[in-house]
Amino acid sequence: MSTDPLRCAGALIVDHDGRIFFQRRSPHRRLFPNCWDIVGGHLEPGEEIDEALRREITEETGWILSHVLGQVGEYHYVGDDGLARIEYDFLVRVDGDLDHPTLEAGKHTEYRWLAEHEVTVLDENRDVNDGLIRRIAEEGFAVLRSIGL
């Protein structure tokens, strides 16, 4: 069995008001149940990061990746399932009806577009020492500011 971390791709989807899209994971999910999260997931065998990013956006929202605005970061963590992961997160724009995402059935229960001053909501249902999704969001908003959006 490989000890290499699972590779993941994540999308911080930005709307025209400079808000970022988050979705709540279903309460029965093994990893981070009932927590807010960005769009993303594990790379399939043989898949490149950009391919996984495109696939995950469409699977989880029904939207189509239009362009990547920049990389937010590379995050190493161990999930509450005990598996090590390395996650590559990107700030992106998408094509589609941003008011009506098609959430992936059984995996997500609701969504929100958050402005930078609203990121504290991301701490809901998270372990007090976690803070990863909020840090990713804060770094995403910093990238947005750095590129003038």
Regions found by a protein language model. Name each.
Residues L6, P33-I38, L83-E87:
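Short connector loops at helix/strand junctions that flank enzyme active sites
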Residues L43-H67, Y75-D127:
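Unchanged
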